[in-house]
């Protein structure tokens, strides 16, 4: 098996499986050491999966049109960039940005699972998709995952802002001299 394929599989499997636990509040709160150690491994795995996916898209003669090639280059690059920005954020101790960028990177990495679901639904409802429909379904899957991730990110950040506003209103105002 070619090295990029091996790297893609060995990176994607732990990234997709172990990555889910990184978002579980109980693991982060009760096992912060595990979260940090697993996070370091998963950054490497995610980058390996993303970069090898980009390499295969660029250099392997895959059955794809320019549309799917564009989707793969766009979302693969976005995954690598999201993971890199998540790493930079945590190194700066910006936990909120770290969480948001890693969630985006993870959502893109989970695209294959959503692609299987959207493809299966299409087959069950309509029939086997043609090449163009198949490629649009693949792109739609990455978009679906990112929309869900953005909804979660914004929902959590808006809850935090509401709590800050309530806390600010509850504090007695001090005179400034």
Range-by-range predicted roles:
Residues 1-177:
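Alpha-helical membrane insertion/targeting regions
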């Amino acid at each position: 098996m070619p090295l990029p394929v091996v790297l893609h599989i060995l990176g994607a499997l732990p990234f997709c499986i172990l990555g889910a636990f990184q978002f579980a509040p109980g693991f982060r709160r009760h096992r912060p050491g595990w979260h940090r150690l697993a996070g370091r491994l998963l950054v490497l795995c995610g980058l390996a999966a993303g970069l090898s996916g980009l390499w295969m898209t660029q250099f392997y003669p895959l059955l794809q049109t320019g549309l799917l090639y564009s989707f793969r280059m766009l979302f693969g690059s976005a995954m690598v960039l999201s993971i890199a920005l998540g790493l930079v954020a945590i190194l700066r101790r910006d936990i909120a940005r770290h969480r948001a960028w890693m969630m985006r990177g993870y959502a893109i990495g989970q695209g294959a699972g959503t692609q299987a679901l959207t493809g299966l639904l299409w087959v069950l409802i309509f029939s086997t998709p043609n090449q163009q429909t198949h490629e649009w379904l693949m792109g739609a899957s990455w978009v679906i995952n990112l929309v869900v991730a953005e909804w979660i990110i914004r929902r959590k950040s808006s809850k935090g802002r509401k709590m800050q506003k309530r806390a600010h209103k509850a504090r007695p105002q001090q005179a400034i001299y």
